[in-house]
Amino acid sequence: MSSRPPSSSGPAGIPKGAPSQRQLRVAEEIRHVLAGVFARQEFRDPELATTTFTINEVRISPDLKHATVFISRLGSSEIEPLLPNLKRVATYLRGEVAKVMRLRYAPELHFQPDSALEYAMHVDSLLRRPEVKRDLDE
């Protein structure tokens, strides 16, 4: 029996819960494939065909069966109204991913609005306030 306390990192010092290299590679490839499909606007949904999207990040589960796609809409911050439309075309997008990638299972796609840019803009606006600038200059 080992006398060492349980550590918060896995083999080779990799933190538990951190994505593996394979997860990162597969997620980036999915992002690339989806970006191509969105750029070509190959949708039967008229609302999606006239909207420009940016896929900021894809996170994939350890078993590579579920992928969460973080997406934003260019020209507008409102992506929530289009999430049902994206859910409707998710099967088509999954098929497009399956055509390009060699995986045992094509991952099920889940779309989430990406709020990182909004958060960064909020922090920037806070830092530009006169009272904060005054405190930072001291």
From Swiss-Prot:
Record's compositionally biased regions (Low complexity): 1-20
Cell compartment(s), UniProt: Cytoplasm
PROSITE patterns reported in the protein's UniProt record: RBFA
Protein's UniProt keywords contain Cytoplasm: yes
Region: Disordered, residue numbers: 1-21
GO MF terms held by the record: ribosomal small subunit binding
GO biological process, one term: maturation of SSU-rRNA
Function field: One of several proteins that assist in the late maturation steps of the functional core of the 30S ribosomal subunit. Associates with free 30S ribosomal subunits (but not with 30S subunits that are part of 70S ribosomes or polysomes). Required for efficient processing of 16S rRNA. May interact with the 5'-terminal helix region of 16S rRNA.
Record's protein name: Ribosome-binding factor A
Species assigned in the record: Granulibacter bethesdensis (strain ATCC BAA-1260 / CGDNIH1)
Species lineage: Bacteria, Pseudomonadati, Pseudomonadota, Alphaproteobacteria, Acetobacterales
Gene name in the database record: rbfA
